[in-house]
């Protein structure tokens, strides 16, 4: 009985360790996915802010040029 019980116990421990290892790998994958999604969302917000700033600067430049042309034609 001793030898069979020992062999079964080792298989059970290996199975438990494998289960813990798989769980750890899954948790790391979930955490990496979370960080990837957070990074993507932050990048999207930053891109939106940059685009809005660029459009605002472009509009200001166009308005200044339009006023300059309007002033030239009024003179």
From Swiss-Prot:
Coiled coil, from the record: none
Positions of short motif QXSXEXXXL: 13-21
Record's keyword annotation contains Nucleotide-binding: no
Keyword annotations: Fimbrium, Secreted
Highest taxon of source: Archaea
InterPro entries (UniProt xref): Class3_signal_pept_motif
UniProt xrefs under Pfam families: Class_IIIsignal
Gene Ontology CC, one term: membrane
Free-text disruption phenotype from the record: Disruption of the gene does not change the piliation compared with the parent cells.
Positions of the pro-segment in this chain: 1-12
Post-translational events: The N-terminus is probably cleaved by the prepilin peptidase EppA, which recognizes the class III signal sequence.
Induction and repression of expression: Expressed under standard laboratory conditions at 35 degrees Celsius.
Protein localization: Secreted; Cell surface; Fimbrium
Record remark on domains: Contains an amino terminal motif QXSXEXXXL, which is part of a class III signal sequence.
Name this protein carries in UniProt: Probable minor pilin MMP0903
């Amino acid at each position: 009985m001793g030898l069979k019980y020992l062999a079964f116990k080792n298989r059970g421990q290996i199975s438990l360790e494998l289960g813990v290892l798989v769980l750890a790998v899954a948790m790391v994958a979930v955490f990496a996915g979370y960080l990837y999604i957070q990074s993507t969302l932050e990048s999207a917000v930053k891109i939106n802010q940059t685009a809005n700033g660029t459009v605002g600067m472009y509009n200001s430049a166009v308005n200044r040029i339009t006023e300059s042309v309007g002033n030239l034609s009024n003179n």
